[in-house]
Structures are given as structure tokens and as C-alpha cells.
Design a protein with these regions (language model features):
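Glycine/proline-enriched, intrinsically flexible loops and inter-domain linkers
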Residues: 1-848
Length: 848
């Protein structure tokens, strides 16, 4: 605050605009790190939040003590390692950046059957190999598994780009800032893919504790405050970037009190060719200039990747949360597209996790060396140490390789768009990463160090099947009041309306929206998938959807992943997606899998869960023909939360997979939505219902987990999906909806609420694997099912196309606004559509 003297007061100026200014009374300096013993280096790692693994520490020491290395370092006036070098190595070796867990060696043991298997790299065996195998069969797959995002063919003139990421740790610390930088950060991945793409879409998924949690634990942020901040952060990041946000998910569970999950996904589009070169190819060459464009570097975002590679606790550094500025990034986005189109960009990547350390360090591998002048890096304020400049994750920055002859034009375009661009170094083929500060070398590390000399992480994985863990099917008699039961389930937090979130996000910007996030007569029911037209002159579009169901992990993570993939596929098929063009993005969030008898006594079981999840990923991507265009693993979704007596309790999040599926649609005018359309239309159930209520919404309501988790028979289901896709393409389907969480009863209510029409529905006609009681038919969550409405005039043609599939006409749409469900001639449920919708909307209402 400030006191103004009367003589100094100017009524025209008033108090003015006080602008915060950071002033650091600190002279930048490089610190030499003593490495006399492994224990000493381990203490330094803990003190500096480096998250170095014990097995990595001897390798680092041995490297810096080698005679040949010492001799070379003396030529640049270095001896012992510097803090800059140690920070660089720890960033590059972090699980967040190097995916050490997924590249690790797992010794799997099934304690029930005695089966033993050694899995050498989950990434290689379950992600890379299946994707490369499918890439040979799918000519639309352009680029996978090496760049910032995957690339697929949209048409002969354009490629689409897709990727996904999480921003869990920073969002858990500071919800708004963490989520905002999460969404603008994922936007930079398509911008840094190939020679750069235009952003066309963003998506979100949040997993948090119960919004109205009132238990005895005290998480760092209450779930309500956390969720509000996350929603606002993604809103500001997306809306202010001019990128539509047409799809999202939200899930509540107490296991996320320790650490929330914030998934963000982005898509872009780029011309297939830039001049005579394919747009997805890029390389750095000796002599290319290293240019940093966009924002400046500050102390925000330091140790982001290492904080994300550990359990969240009271010791997690607050400084790892970045500060985002979407307007700066929007200007940079437009500038870089213009520079790309003029052929000025040889290579581009974003400064995300690890900052310059990651962006320059990884891009220099192509040329096999680089030199960076850290004193040339633009700073938000003076006083940053050299290591802070190098690893800071300050936002809105890209690294571009520019030929010297293109520099003047590149800088001219940068000034035109009011974007700051600075030459900070040069790529070379020296075999070294060299960092200088005011003419003095502060880092000198061989390029091959990180590739060749560190040991593979190893894990013991012990699987105990669910029955041996004490899980069993509960004994529940048939409910007497099905109407009240359905209304109760519709009002549950993981089923009810989330319109208050979707309506905050701009999905119409850029003008390409085809199927919106909310559909139906009142535009208030969530759609199965989003469909956009990225090229407005064409009818061609992209359908994209996501699925998330971690509750099945309580029984078996293999089935959880299978069901999640199947649901995402069905959602895309239901709007008109092409079953021959399904691209996937896998985003794993997993609790720590490293066994520790005190800190993580169930680590071996969690490791086995991860192995089984990846086996399912491999099996079902191959079965459905889904190459994994991109993906991300975010481990350590554990947190230590304060209890009522001051104790700290560890909470591990449910093993979680967010699976994204995208598909190219030839003609978006043939797309369908989930809302029922016309009285008199026939209602079909496509797919069989089994006794599969394990970990279902119904069992949760009854206080049980159960045992019979939904299973997926891909060989049986995929031909059905192909036939349904053909029926939609031939315009025989009026509406189509994938049945998901909650089962048949919930999704009958949703399609009726969307279309504001009644449904007369007979449970006796539903295709069943075996005889089931009414509540099991209504609330089983069997995979592979759809609700489809068809005009009577199209009945014959539809059934001919679907021949050989488990389908049945089970009801009819009526003008009377009732959901009327009968079995054996008796009505067991009759509720007005308005009342059902009232219960569905009641929990959160209109919170905007």
C-alpha cells in the first residue's frame, strides 16, 4: 500500500497502475558439485529435488571421474561437475522425460497360477512393436513415437496431428496455474510437431476427489477449490488461445485426494508438403542457429519434471508451477505458421518439461552437438543462476533451428507479429552439449552419455487375482422401486450433468464444429464424440472421443484397459467414424510401482497391474487395428495427505487410463447424434448384455465392488462395429449412442432426455448371453453395446446390413414423454422425461 501526500496527488492520474516487479538481489553463479561418494551425491539429489534414482548415481560419478572426460573438461576449464550439468542430467533421466518405468524390466509372477514372465520394456513390447506392425497395414499413419505428437493423413493435402499429456503435480499444487499451463503446454506439442501445425482442437479430463468432500483428511487443496481452479485454468488457456474445446470428461473418487489428474489433449493440422518436403520431417544440422521464440525465462516451472517423478508431499516444491500467458502463445502460433509456410524452419520443438534443457538437449541429438550462450537467453528479470535458466519451464517458448541465410526474414516476421525471438546458440557435430555464460563454460557433457550408460530400471511384479483378494459377487434381491433407483443413479456424481463445465468452453471458435459437446433439443446432453471440420472448404471431418473408467482397476487392470479402449471406439463409431481409420492416444496415470516395505508395501502388486494393463493395450489395439499415434505415462499419482491428528497418510490413485480415439469421416453431413429424433422410430439394442456389474455404478451405489468385471471379445465385436458404421454411412440410422457407465437404464434415460420423446421399452427383447434379472439387464455395464433408433421405413435395410449381429428391436419412440420399461407384460418403471432430467441435473445445477 502507499500513502499519497496532498501536494503530490494528481486527480487525473489517480493512484496509477501498480505493476508488480520481481527484483532478485543475487549475482548468478555456477556451483561445483562434490562427488566424493555415492552417498554425498544422493544427499545433494534430495536437497536439490533432483529425483535421481540410486542406480543412476554411480553412473554419474563414474562419468565425471573418467580420465578421458576429465582431460576433455580441462580444455574448457572445467573439473568437477557443475550444478548446471547435474540439473541437465537429472532432467533428462527423470521418469517424466525418459519414461524409465515403461522402459524398465518387469519380472511378472502370477501368485495363483505360478506363471512367470520377464517383460523387457512395456513401451517396446506393448506400444512400439504393435504400432509399427499396424503402421505397415495403415497407409494413413504418417509419423509415430518420436516427435511431440503423432501424425495421420487427413486427406492428400493435409495431415492431422494429435497428442495427449497430463499436468497433475502442478495442478495439485496450484489448480488454476497448473491447469492453464497444462492446456497451453499441450497446444505447443502440435505446434512443435514436424515443421509445425495449426491448432484445431483441445480436450480435457479431470479426476478429483468428491466435490463436496467432508471427510477427516485435509488435502493440499479441497476438491471443490481444486476443481474450480482447474476448470477455470483450462477455460482461460483454451478460450484465449482461439482453440475450440468440444469434448471433456470428469470423474470423482476419493483415491484422487492425494493427487488429482488433469488430462489435456490437442489436435492440429498441417499441409502435407512444405515446398517440396514432407511437413512431418525435420532435422537439426551443424551450422543451424538455435532460436528461442515466445516468452521469457523466469523462476517459474523449475523442477517440474522431477516433481512429477515423485510422490506428492509437503516437500513438493511450489516453484515447479509455471505461469501461463495464452495471448503471447497465440501470437507465437500465428507467427510460426507464417514462417513455416515460407520454408524458414528446419526444426521446431517446444520448451515444455525441462525447458531449454529438454528442448535443446533432445534436438541436438540430430546434429550430435550444440553450443548455447545462456547469457543471451531473454529473462523476465535478472538474477537467475545458470542452471535455473537452463531448466526453467517458463511457458510460451519454442526452440527453432534456422539456417543462417533465413535468419533475417525469420526475425522480420517475428517483429511483424510482436513476438520476441533470440539467437541463443548453434547446433554442431562436436559430440558435446556445451553451455557458456559470459564467455565461460558452465556445462560440457557428451551427447552419448544419456543414451548408453545408465542401467535399466527393474521391478518385481506380483499379481493376485481378484477372487484371491477376497472379491466376490454380492447377493442383492430385485429392487421393488425401479423408478427411484434410476433417478438415484442419474443423480450420482459420476453420472449426472456436467453442463456447467462444458458451457464455459468455447467450442465454436474457428467455425468447424459439427457435433457439439452438448446435443439434443435443448443442447444439454453430452455427445458421444466431437466432430469438427478442420478444412472449412471440405465436407471431410475428424471425429474424436475419449473414455475413462478406472473403477474396473479394482478388479483387473487388464479388463479396465480393454473396456476403456472399447468404449472410446464405440463412441467414435456412433457418430459416423470409420472403423478402418482409428488412431489412438494412451495416457496412463499410475501409482508408484517400486516396492518399498515401508513407503510402498503394495508396489509389487501395482507393478503387476501396470504389466496387465499394457498387455491389454497391446492386445486390443492389435485387435481393433488402432496404431498408437501418441501417448504419455504419468507415474506417481500418490500423495501424502494430512489426517485429523497431524499424521500424514499416503493415498494412491486408482490405476487410470484415458484413451483417445480419432477417426477421419469422409462426409460430415452423414454424421448422427445420440438424441432420439422422431416418434414412431424403432429402438434397437445392438450387442449382448451379460451378468457384468463388477465395479459398476449400480454396485457402487449398493456399497460393493463385485467380481464380474465387463469383458471384451474384440473378434466378436469389431465386425458388428463395421456393420453399424456402414448403416450410418448409408443414412439408415436416426440416432446412435454407445452404452457406457451406468448401463442400459441410464443411457435409455439420456437418449430420451436428449430428444424429449418417450420410449416404450421391453426388457424381454434385449439380446442376452444368459437369462438375467431385470436390474442386471438395466445396470450391467457389458461392453460392445449401442442404442440405435431407426425409421420403420429403414427397418429392413438396417437389419440386412446388421445380419449376423446380436441386435433386436426392443421398443419404440412415442410423443408421450415417459420412459416406460416393461418385462413379462408388467411395467417396472414409468417416469416422466422431465423428472428424470431434473434428477440428472440436480447435483450441480447451473454452477456457472
Amino acid at each position: 500500500w502507499k500513502i499519497f501526500e496532498k501536494y503530490s496527488w494528481d486527480s487525473k492520474i489517480g493512484i496509477g497502475y501498480p505493476i508488480p516487479k520481481v527484483v532478485l538481489q543475487h549475482e548468478p553463479q555456477v556451483t561445483v558439485i562434490p562427488i566424493s561418494s555415492d552417498e554425498e551425491l544422493k544427499r545433494i539429489s534430495q536437497k536439490r529435488n533432483l529425483a535421481l534414482r540410486d542406480s543412476d548415481i554411480p553412473v554419474i560419478r563414474q562419468y565425471f571421474l573418467r580420465e578421458d572426460v576429465l582431460r576433455e573438461r580441462k580444455e574448457v576449464e572445467l573439473d568437477l561437475p557443475t550444478d548446471v550439468e547435474l540439473e541437465y542430467i537429472s532432467q533428462a533421466r527423470s521418469d517424466h522425460c525418459n519414461h524409465n518405468t515403461f522402459r524398465g524390466l518387469f519380472r511378472y509372477h502370477n501368485l495363483s497360477t505360478g506363471q512367470k514372465e520377464v517383460v523387457d520394456s512395456l513401451f517396446k513390447t506393448c506400444i512400439e512393436e504393435p504400432t509399427l506392425e499396424l503402421m505397415k497395414k495403415k497407409d494413413w499413419v504418417i509419423s509415430v513415437l518420436w516427435d511431440n505428437a503423432g501424425v495421420g493423413r487427413f486427406d492428400e493435402d493435409n495431415y492431422y496431428v494429435i497428442t495427449g499429456e497430463t499436468h497433475n503435480s502442478p495442478s495439485n499444487m496450484e489448480a488454476y496455474g497448473g491447469a492453464l499451463t497444462g492446456i497451453v503446454g499441450i497446444y505447443r506439442d502440435p505446434m512443435g510437431t514436424g515443421k509445425g501445425s495449426k491448432l484445431i482442437l483441445g480436450m480435457y479430463a479431470y479426476c478429483v476427489g468428491p466435490r463436496d468432500y467432508s471427510g477427516e483428511l485435509s488435502p493440499h487443496l479441497h476438491p471443490r477449490r481444486l476443481l474450480d481452479g482447474v476448470i477455470e485454468g483450462v477455460r482461460d488457456g483454451g478460450n484465449k488461445s482461439g482453440v475450440p474445446t468440444p469434448y471433456g470428461l470428469l470423474l470423482f473418487d476419493e483415491s484422487y485426494l492425494g493427487k488429482c489428474l488433469v488430462f489435456v489433449t490437442a489436435m492440429g493440422i498441417m499441409p502435407a508438403k512444405i515446398g517440396a518436403e514432407s511437413s512431418h520431417k525435420k532435422v537439426t544440422s551443424p551450422g543451424d542457429l538455435i532460436v528461442m521464440s515466445g516468452g521469457r525465462v523466469g523462476k517459474d516451472g523449475i523442477h517440474g519434471v522431477t516433481a512429477a517423478s515423485e510422490t506428492y508431499s509437503e516437500h513438493t516444491p511450489a516453484g515447479h508451477v509455471q505461469i501461463g500467458d495464452p495471448y503471447t502463445q497465440k501470437k507465437m502460433h500465428d507467427f510460426l505458421l507464417e514462417a513455416r509456410d515460407e520454408g524458414l524452419i528446419s526444426f521446431i520443438t517446444d520448451c515444455g518439461g525441462g525447458g531449454l534443457s529438454s528442448a535443446v538437449g533432445e534436438s541436438a541429438r540430430f546434429s550430435n552437438g550444440c553450443r548455447v550462450d545462456l547469457d543471451k537467453v531473454p529473462l523476465k528479470y535478472e538474477g537467475l543462476d545458470q542452471w535455473e535458466i537452463w531448466v526453467s519451464e517458463s511457458q510460451e517458448r519454442m526452440i527453432i533451428a534456422v539456417k543462417p541465410e533465413h535468419l533475417d526474414r525469420f526475425m522480420e516476421l517475428s517483429r511483424k507479429h510482436a513476438v520476441e525471438s533470440t539467437v541463443i546458440g548453434e547446433y554442431n557435430d562436436s559430440g558435446y552439449l556445451r553451455l557458456d555464460y559470459k564467455g565461460k563454460t558452465c556445462a560440457y557433457v557428451r551427447m552419448d552419455l544419456l543414451k548408453s550408460e545408465f542401467p535399466q530400471w527393474e521391478f518385481d511384479a506380483e499379481w493376485t487375482p481378484p477372487r484371491l483378494r477376497g472379491l466376490a459377487e454380492p447377493v442383492i434381491a430385485e429392487p421393488e422401486d425401479h423408478g427411484s433407483l434410476l433417478k438415484d443413479i442419474l443423480a450420482r456424481p459420476n453420472i449426472c450433468s456436467r453442463n456447467w463445465i462444458a458451457r464455459q468452453y468455447d467450442h465454436e471458435v474457428q467455425g468447424g464444429s459439427v457435433i457439439k459437446p452438448l446435443v439434443g433439443r435443448q443442447r444439454d446432453i453430452p455427445s458421444d464424440a466431437a466432430v469438427i471440420r478442420p478444412v472449412l472448404e471440405k465436407k471431410k471431418g475428424i471425429a474424436v472421443s475419449q473414455a475413462l473408467n478406472p473403477f474396473y482397476s479394482q478388479i483387473d487392470t487388464y479388463d479396465m484397459v480393454a473396456a476403456t479402449i472399447d468404449e472410446a471406439v464405440r463412441k467414435v463409431i456412433s457418430v459416423g467414424g470409420d472403423p478402418e481409420h482409428l488412431g489412438g492416444v494412451d495416457n496412463f496415470c499410475w501409482p508408484s510401482v517400486e516396492y518399498d516395505p515401508v513407503e510402498n508395501p503394495d508396489g509389487k502388486y501395482k507393478a503387476a497391474q501396470l504389466v496387465r494393463a499394457n498387455w491389454a493395450l497391446r492386445d486390443y489395439c492389435l485387435a481393433y487395428g488402432i496404431p498408437l499415434l501418441s501417448g504419455k505415462d504419468s507415474m506417481y499419482i500418490d500423495g501424502k495427505v494430512r489426517g485429523p491428528y497431524g499424521e500424514r497418510r499416503k493415498i494412491s490413485g486408482l490405476p487410470t487410463l484415458l484413451f483417445t480415439v480419432c477417426s477421419v469421416i469422409e462426409d460430415v453431413t452423414k454424421c448422427v447424434t445420440m438424441d432420439v429424433k422422431f416418434p414412431g422410430d424403432l429402438v434397437y439394442v445392438v450387442g449382448e448384455t451379460s451378468d457384468e456389474l463388477g465395479a459398476s455404478e449400480f454396485y457402487q451405489r449398493m456399497g460393493h465392488i463385485g467380481l464380474n468385471v465387463p469383458k471384451v471379445d474384440a473378434k466378436k465385436l469389431f465386425p458388428v462395429y463395421a456393420r453399424l458404421a456402414r448403416a450410418i454411412d448409408e443414412e439408415l440410422v436416426a440416432s446412435c449412442h454407445a452404452i457406457g457407465r451406468g448401463g442400459l437404464g441410464v443411457h435409455l434415460a439420456l437418449i430420451a432426455m436428449a430428444g424429449e420423446l418417450g420410449i416404450d421399452f421391453s426388457l424381454d427383447e434385449v439380446p442376452l448371453v444368459s437369462q438375467l434379472s431385470p436390474y442386471r439387464v438395466l445396470y450391467s455395464e457389458s461392453c460392445g453395446r449401442f442404442l440405435v433408433t431407426v425409421s420403420p421405413k429403414n427397418k429392413k435395410a438396417f437389419e440386412q446390413i446388421m445380419a449376423g449381429s446380436p441386435i433386436a428391436p426392443v421398443g419404440k419412440l412415442t410423443e408421450d414423454p415417459f420412459l416406460n420399461i416393461t418385462t413379462k407384460g408388467h411395467t417396472i418403471l414409468k417416469e416422466t422425461i422431465d423428472e428424470l432430467k431434473g434428477y440428472w441435473k440436480r447435483p450441480f445445477g447451473d454452477l456457472i
